[in-house]
Amino acid sequence: MKNLLVPLAIIGAGVLTYSASVSSRTLINIDPDWAFAFGHTDPAKDFGRGTEYFNYLTKANSIHNAGPYSPKFNDSLWHRVDLPFDFVVDLPYDSLASHSHGYKTVGYKYPETSVGWYRKTFTLQPEDSTAHYDLMFDGIFRDSQVWVNGFYLGGEPSGYTRQRYDITPYLNYGPDSDNVIAVRSDATFEEGWFYEGGGIYRHAWLEKSPLVRLMPDKTRVQYSSSDNGNGKVTVSGIIENLSHADIKDLKVIVNITSLSGQPVPGGASSISVPAVIKPRGEAKWHIDLKPQDLKLWSPDTPERYDVTVTLQDNGRDIESERIRTGFRTLTFDPDKGLFVNGRHYKIHGVDQHQDHPGAGAGIQDAVNVYRLKELKKYGINTVRTSHNPFTPEAIAAADSLGIMLVEENRLLGINDYHTGQLEKMIDRDFNHPSVILWSVGNEEWGVEWDKRGDRIVKDLRNISHSLDSTRLMTVATSSGPTVVISPDVAGYNYIMQNPVEEHRRNYPDRIAFGSEETTGSGTRGVYFDDKANGHMASLNRTPDKDGTLNRIARGWTFYRDRPWLLGLCYWTGFDYRGEPNPLVFPATGSEFGILDYAGFPKDEAFYLQSQWTDQPVLHILPHWNLEGHEGETIDIWVYSNMDEVELNVNGRNLGRKKVTPGQHVSFPAVYKPGKVTAKGYKNGKPVKTSVTETSGPAEKLDIETAHEQDGIRIINVTLRDRKGRFAPTACNPLTIHLSEGQTLLGSGNGDPAFRIKERPAPGEHPDAFTLPAFNGHAQFIVKGSGPVNITLDK
């Protein structure tokens, strides 16, 4: 069998930070203070967009333009919002709206609430007029159009692709000369079959740089190992000349330092670029370095470094770019699996959409970090970014936390629309060590069973390798065989749908992993179906069509016991808005996650924690507040990594059972309010005791700041009874009282049938906000310092 060693196994990091000097590149965040209003799909109701005699497509900057893209347009009656701002979050629900998008009133049935307009006014100083300016949007959903000072810049159909526009010649300078950015986003059509939101839901930037600069997203840092462990680092890039004169005799200097700024021995070098670069011309460069004693990046040791690239002209620094990156090698072996820096890792993964209560698709950076940290608690070491690239900030967070990523492009195809998205994704995230695979598609049913699928994937494999020779690519199939013949790594969505063993016999050199596998999860804290109210019990406690109980265990043990499989990603990590299958309205969100929508754990999270971490786990389910089921026989399960588990119910010892690795233990018992106690044994000795007890009504609150970053706090609330016992069915209203300087950014409770207001609407600034808890938990996302006062309505 052959070993596939990813050459120059990459590295990198990629949140770019820049020197703040005037001559250097400066990345200016322009999220605050935008004007927002709904437009319409009918041009006559869309502020007259495009109806002028000379419209924005007729003349470059027609004086007849009067719509929101015109600098003279009056937006004083519009709402003021800060980005990211997903305008769909505040829309009502409707049982006739899109099932896949969570029954929000957006889409082709709702022309009056599917188009969002954004405007921002800013000024530049006269001394800034010698710089180059790019306007960037990390994500606008979707079918966006962008103008600056009335000049139409272009647009992007997809909601998941970064946009960059040169706006240098269109700008005004001076304190009395305004500049106006206008953006129109149209969420009429869906790209996904899951909630996608609408509008500018990711960050916006103004990038100021010198006219001679390092081409954005083209500086690459590559690492290759050597026998002595030191390895080689190659840094390469492109210089572009945006001035009106020839440029020559430039110099590029590279320095590798620790995050604290300490130089790495052997981590400095320079190269002259003698070529004459014509206006709008380019020059490529590369530098090889042999740094000593590098600490390599891995899921267990996510070591990172700063690689600073300085561009000089006659000894004068004209630009400096800092790339935060990590160094590591990847080996994919068709018989033994994945190796990072020579150490074997099994993929313990989840698939993940990117939305959250109160924010929708416009997730704050702090919330992205919170979500990844919560997943890591339960042993997750890999996330597949289903089914589109994540935000740059989430990718950087994965670097710092040691979470590997399978980063996925939005749509399968080989034309400019598809490959342009793929190229932008790879260019943006090439320097991130967390990214281990590029995924070029997911469940393309129309071509999974015929030769076209094979041809498309072969082309995409070659295109991917031409864009990045250091990583392999994959594609996910739901059952059709043709699209998993040609990729570097086959991705299987569900072992019940794919003949994985047969493919192994037919293609023994193929590398493969489980790109999706069922968790079997249901509604957190629900053990009896209540589908009329949008809640369902976990499928794990009901036999599947093959007779299997505990489907999540079926998936893990299948991949665990086959060393030739890299591992698996469960569908999903968090619940997400939309796609509430198999339920319909009033359910509005999925229930596939091991964590609910807000990040509170379901029972399945503890199953994975028992299998994927070394910490002792002894988790009892169900809870013991099963009102209405008195006298019924209940199967009490325990998820554990102990050797044996002993169970006591209401003072009666039900015995001690051996734990089959990867499985649960079960004890039938008649339900009566009281106490369930589990005791776990290792090597015959008691190691851990867990208790679940029937609680009284909620009377107390545990308030925890689960994560704090950038002045934003994720505050989790747990409801308890008078004795301090968790109240697992409590749904009491909670009120957060905001003090001066505090803003509620969002709230949620993990209820997959949530259909009420989750944040103040634009223009509202309440002193208090009320949210019901759901099955003992709730969450508030607060911006601003100071104590937080949350009260319980008993």
Q: At which residue positions do the language-model features occur?
A:
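Extended substrate-binding grooves/exosites of carbohydrate-active enzymes
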Residues: 30, 38, 46-67, 72, ...
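Extended acidic/polar, glycine-enriched regions
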Residues: 174, 238-333, 664, 672-673, ...
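Short, hydrophobic beta-strand segments
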Residues: 167-169, 286-296, 666-671, 764-786
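Extended carbohydrate-recognition surfaces in non-catalytic/accessory domains of CAZymes
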Residues: 21-136, 191, 197-200, 574, ...
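Short S/T/G/P-enriched beta-strand
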Residues: 332, 613-635, 691-714, 720-723, ...
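Short flexible loop/turn segments that cap and initiate beta-strands
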Residues: 73, 247-253, 266, 299-306, ...
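Accessory beta-strand-rich segments of carbohydrate-active enzymes
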Residues: 38-41, 87-90, 108-220, 242, ...
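Beta-strand-rich structural segments
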Residues: 235-239, 634-640, 679, 710-728, ...
